[in-house]
Amino acid sequence: MQLRLVEAAHILPVGAQYSTDDVRNGLALSPTYHRAFDNALIFLDENFVMRINPTKELQLTTLRLDGGLPDFKSYLGKKIHLPPDKRQWPESNMIRRANAYRRIAT
C-alpha cells in the first residue's frame, strides 16, 4: 500500500534559474516538512543539516502562530539521511543557490 508519507522536494525550486530535476537537486521529505521547506521555514545547510529559518520563526512567534513549533523543531538540527551513493547526495551549489533564492542567511 502506498501511503504517500514521503514526497520529492526540489532543493532549488523549479521556477528558479539553474534548477534541475536531477536527483542532486532533490530531497525526500514528509508533506509537512516539504511545505515548510518550500515556504522557507526550514532550510538545508551545506553540512546537510536541516535547520529552522530564524527570520520565519520570529515572524511566527510575533504573530503568535508558533503553537507546536518546539515539537516541529525537535526533528531539526541533525544531519539528514543520505544515500549510500555519494553521487546522489544533494549538490552544495544547489543548496547555496536555494538558500540565496529564499533569502536565508547561513
Where are these predicted regions, by residue range?
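A detector for short metal-coordination/catalytic motifs
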Residues: 3-106
